[in-house]
Amino acid sequence: MTNSKGRSITDKTSGGPSSGGGFVDWTLRLNTIQSDKFLNLLLSMVPVIYQKNQEDRHKKANGIWQDGLSTAVQTFSNRSEQHMEYHSFSEQSFHANNGHASSSCSQKYDDYANYNYCDGRETSETTAMLQDEDISSDGDEDAIVEVTPKLPKESSGIMALQILVPFLLAGFGTVSAGMVLDIVQHWEVFRKVTEVFILVPALLGLKGNLEMTLASRLSTAVNIGKMDSPIEKWNLIIGNLALKQVQATVVGFLAAVAAIILGWIPEGKYYLDHSILLCSSSVATAFIASLLQGIIMVGVIVGSKKTGINPDNVATPIAASFGDLITLAILAWISQGLYSCLETYYYISPLVGVFFLALTPIWIIIAAKHPATRTVLHSGWEPVITAMVISSIGGLILDTTVSDPNLVGIVVYTPVINGIGGNLVAIQASRISTYLHLHSIPGELPDEPKGCYYPFRTFFGPGVNNKSAQVLLLLVIPGHLIFLYTIHLMKSGHTSLTIIFIVVYLFGAVLQVFTLLWIADWMVHHFWRKGKDPDSFSIPYLTALGDLLGTALLALSFHFLWLIGDRDGDVGD
């Protein structure tokens, strides 16, 4: 049945005595809704995201929805004057007042790529899709579906503009880290205790293991409406920061152990004082850097929410903007300081490590008190530790390459190629994760083409995630050209910019990001199908793979350049 407004009206009755034989006076209800301009204004100002497939977010308690909006506001979400698109589907509705579950069928989506989300502002990523559902007090269930023209989706240009500024900011942060590493590689601690080079990718990878995971997790919480309440928001923030400090301390210690083992295997020599220095430096660096970056990240995400910018586009690259620089500077400073105290004040190094390790129980208690992080505290160690091991293998490649005087020029470019690849794939993983949180439940995927995840499906499909993969891949070449030229202008490094070097370097960078985006498409959906949160599981693996691929491809590139005789510059001098 269709009314004068072009809405399709479906009436289901529960057979209650007050249902009036199954007929409802829709004229009065629609007129009341259409006259409520004040609620319309409020609804357009408040960032709200509705998720129809999570029934617990739609239970009615004392006439008020758990989302914080009344039933009238929920019903009024079909605003014809704003020409918003509503996708028609049937789902099971739960009546909290009588416990009656109506007949239902599985969700049918019109188009996998047509689901959008936003915070109600024009500057946000897309427009909110508020589904209609009205549950009357007498047990009637009525569904109103409005058919209106489609709202234009986020274009590739708008997406690129939102990503570009934080991407460049993060890129210049990695360039700064590369130049710092190029300087500190000549410090005494880096020359005498070469295992510190193995620590570099593992500790810089903490931004992928922890900072980007935190950014993606909080971005998803913002986009699905879990941070609308101030109490809930601060519970999430405090719990996640405490969890991150626990993970940073443990991962920092394990990274030092991995560096000691990987350094001892090829040389066959073991020094106890060097091992203590590595453990103390790694734990202290991980703790301090993680705390500073976590505070910055919370500010970025809260600010993004208030300004209407999609945090998925900006949070993860900003998480790495100064992360590499801060982490590397702290590592170099602490390592050199502890190394200078080895002979005269030998007890300082173990005391530093014991102090930061002793703080771990405090952070565990805080994180365990918050339900949002209690689960991750018990089950979120596998990806973090595995990612640390993968990054440490990349560090072993870096340590071996730097030991060759002909390939010392690799140092300044390692944080750049690793950081850029990790930033781009983290953006994609965060966007896919948010999409899945909005349009399906863990363990189930939205309707989409079946089969294996081959590259053509990742980059040339019709969905919004395919579009973002194209945009991110197109940013690789211009971004790296800017960063290469910046390094050249700063007269940093040991490598001149020749045409052959630029071509080989860009080929390795594009291959790295192409592979990472392809893997991300499969990995995020894989963890979601297994019922695991992709924000906590996929990003550590992806950024660690970015470190390993970036370091390996860069080492191969320098070997190739040396073999073909590209020595007109000062490669390896």
Curated annotation (Swiss-Prot):
Q: Which family does it belong to?
A: Belongs to the SLC41A transporter family.
Q: Which InterPro entries match?
A: SLC41_membr_dom, SLC41_membr_dom_sf, SLC41A1-3
Bilayer-spanning residue ranges: 163-183, 196-216, 246-266, 283-303, 314-334, 348-368, 377-397, 407-427, 470-490, 499-519, 544-564
Extracellular-facing ranges: 1-162, 217-245, 304-313, 369-376, 428-469, 520-543
What's the gene? SLC41A2
Protein's name in the database: Solute carrier family 41 member 2
Q: Which GO terms describe its biological process?
A: cobalt ion transport; iron ion transport; magnesium ion transport; manganese ion transport; nickel cation transport
- What does this gene product do? Acts as a plasma-membrane magnesium transporter. Can also mediate the transport of other divalent metal cations in an order of Ba(2+) > Ni(2+) > Co(2+) > Fe(2+) > Mn(2+).
Q: Which GO terms describe its cellular component?
A: plasma membrane
Name the catalysed reactions: Mg(2+)(in) = Mg(2+)(out); Mn(2+)(in) = Mn(2+)(out); Co(2+)(in) = Co(2+)(out); Ni(2+)(in) = Ni(2+)(out)
Q: Which domain of life is it from?
A: Eukaryota
- Membrane-related topology note: Multi-pass membrane protein
> Which Pfam families does this one have?
MgtE (PF01769)
Query: Which species is the source of this protein?
Result: Homo sapiens
List Phosphoserine occurrences by residue. S136, S137
Q: Which Gene3D superfamilies match?
A: SLC41 divalent cation transporters, integral membrane domain
